[in-house]
Amino acid sequence: MDRNKSFDPNLFKRVDINLLKRNDQLIGKPTTNSIEIIKRLFQNKWAILFFLLIVVIVLLAIIVPLTSPFSAVTPVSTNALAQNLPPRYLWHKPGDILVHKITARSIAEISQASGVLVGTLPSANSNPLATNVQYDIAPFQLQELRNYFPLLGTNGLGIDIWTLLWASVAKSLWIAVVVAIIAMVFGTIYGAVAGSFVGHMADNIMSRIIEIIDIVPSILWIIVLGATFRFGGVKQFDDSVVIFTLIFVFWTWPATTTRIYILKNKDTEYIQAAKTLGAHQIRIIFVHMLPVVFGRLAVVFVSLIPAVIGYEASLVFLGLKPATDIGLGALLNQVTSSDNVALILSSIVSFAVLTVAARTFANALNDAIDPRVVKR
């Protein structure tokens, strides 16, 4: 370097070193892997949105059935006029909402006596052979319904749809989560053991068992197992029968997924290093192998929830569960024979939102956990 070379001082500016960001001077506790995963997860705005949706759905499923003054299994009133009521809000007066009815003359005469009939009934002498009449009523003029404000109205049985909806979501979520947890625990352990002993007799036998179960259609397994339980004296599927049959059907999914990802990672450097250091096979499986596939297993777990709800619905359609039972499956079954817009939209939208939110959040969680994604 030429020491005699001159520099223009105007090209430089003094900077206080204390104002610089000095990473080498930062002192603090090292962050754990779980904290880093949470940070990466909530940097995804879609993950935050759908996580909040799931939280809202779960909270409503817990709070609404507990706080609602109405039951999810009994009508709001014994009066036939309480069936298929439209929504009513605080600004509606009792006489503001009219309902068009085509029903038996006897019921119409009851409504006339109740003081809720709008207009007059056709004379019996005008058509004495007529069994049905058309008329308009103001159902909220009934004394027992004057202070009733249904957010979504009532169904054909007179049950409050808002309460029924969230009680059904709670029941289906409870069954789905129980099935998913047990199927995941058993399937993950099964798949990890099979994958770590690949090439041995144990893996061959365990893999054949999975293939035998998977080759038979799932719905057939459900029917056969359900029929077996019914031979034991159970006339229809109760919750324990549903949970058992669905666990039997779905445990092979996480087992297969775990085995595949164990096979992909069993020859990696850190696994070979653990073997060289003398780590026990159980420690290698549960400490070194399984954490690598947690992201994919999270996707499988939340994907099981809408799948379980769908299969639960199929039990209602097959007549293996009573159509009057509480659950999203039974609620969706009611949609097929109803023209109640509130019932149709609420059941379909709730199922769709829950499914999309769960799958999207699972994919975001997989991206946050998977080390191959993090390194990109």
Swiss-Prot record:
Chief site of localization: membrane
All copies of domain ABC transmembrane type-1, residue ranges: 169-366
Bilayer topology term: Multi-pass membrane protein
A Gene Ontology molecular function term of the record: transmembrane transporter activity
An example Gene Ontology biological process: peptide transport
Recorded superkingdom: Bacteria
Keyword Cell membrane attributed: yes
InterPro entries tied to this protein: BP-dependent_transpt_permease, MetI-like, MetI-like_sf, OppC_N
GO cellular component terms, semicolon-separated: plasma membrane
Subcellular location: Cell membrane
Membrane spanning stretches: 46-66, 149-169, 173-193, 209-229, 242-262, 297-317, 341-361
Function noted in UniProt: Part of the ABC transporter complex OppABCDF involved in the uptake of oligopeptides. Probably responsible for the translocation of the substrate across the membrane.
Family to which this protein belongs: Belongs to the binding-protein-dependent transport system permease family. OppBC subfamily.
Protein name listed in UniProt: Oligopeptide transport system permease protein OppC
UniProt organism field: Mycoplasma genitalium (strain ATCC 33530 / DSM 19775 / NCTC 10195 / G37)
Gene name, Swiss-Prot/TrEMBL: oppC
